[in-house]
Curated annotation (Swiss-Prot):
This is Small ribosomal subunit protein uS3. The keyword rRNA-binding applies. Belongs to the universal ribosomal protein uS3 family. One of its GO terms (molecular function) is structural constituent of ribosome. Part of the 30S ribosomal subunit. Forms a tight complex with proteins S10 and S14. The gene is rpsC. InterPro entries: KH_dom (IPR004087), KH_dom-like_a/b (IPR015946), KH_dom_type_2 (IPR004044), KH_sf_prok-type (IPR009019), Ribosomal_S3_C_sf (IPR036419), Ribosomal_uS3_bac-typ (IPR005704), Ribosomal_uS3_C (IPR001351), Ribosomal_uS3_CS (IPR018280). Keywords: Ribonucleoprotein, Ribosomal protein, RNA-binding, rRNA-binding. GO terms for biological process: translation. NCBIfam families: rpsC_bact. Residues 38-106 form the KH type-2 domain.
Length: 223
């Protein structure tokens, strides 16, 4: 049987960038474990803040963290109180100077992780899985997605035997490297056990010249 490679990792270095940007020789394992700790801590603290990705950059004794969220107001808090509290907690966790940058997600319905979390939340709230999946897919297509595929696996509707249900709309080219496909896997904890929710969203093609133009404009903006 043909196995599916993770679409995010498959495109790293082609149209996707790394989520951890640092180099280490001897301390690689220590930094990697620290990255995992940081990501888990942020996920735990910002459960309801619709966080899609966390990017980590390192320089000397400084850690720069970019949090991509659909609810920046919730992360920042009144007068920046919440983000300052989070920064202090991360300072203690890592023992380094932490700088946090909040990036707003303009279209949350085009982020696979957020769509998956939405489906999972509905499944936990006892909404019928077909309805939850189809509503999420319709919202994504209305937001401008070229295609979407969703999959739910487990004891659906409390059935004795677990099974897998898939629905798709539009096209999702998994082996075209220039295709901007976002993928995420999320768990839904229901009274009947855990369900796995997978989401693939195709957002169009990223052509090399477009990518280079974006890179050049960023470099010019930084000068």
């Amino acid at each position: 049987m043909g196995q599916k490679v993770n679409p995010n990792g498959f495109r790293v270095g082609v149209i996707r960038d790394w989520q951890a940007k640092w180099y280490a020789d001897k301390d690689f394992s220590k930094f990697l474990a620290e990255d995992i700790k940081i990501r888990e801590f942020i996920a735990k603290q910002l459960t309801d803040a619709s966080v899609s990705t966390v990017e980590i950059e390192r320089a000397a004794n400084r850690v720069n963290i970019s949090i991509h969220t659909a609810k920046p107001g919730m992360v920042i808090g009144k007068g920046g109180s919440e983000v300052e509290k989070l920064r202090n907690q991360l300072n203690q966790l890592t023992g380094k100077r932490v700088h946090i940058n909040i990036v707003e997600i303009k279209k949350p319905d085009l982020e696979a992780k957020l769509v998956g979390e939405n489906i999972a939340a509905q499944l936990e709230g006892r909404v019928a899985f077909r309805r939850a999946m189809k509503q999420a897919m319709q919202r994504s297509m209305r937001s401008g997605a070229k295609g979407i595929k969703t999959q739910v696996a487990g004891r659906l509707n409390g059935a004795d035997m677990s099974r897998v249900e898939r629905y798709s709309e539009g096209k999702v080219p998994l082996h075209t490297l220039r295709a901007d496909v976002d993928y995420a896997w999320v768990e839904a904890r229901t009274t009947y056990g855990q369900l796995g929710v997978k989401t693939w969203i195709y957002r169009g093609e990223i052509l090399p010249e477009v990518k280079d133009a974006k890179k050049n404009s960023k470099e010019q903006g930084g000068k």
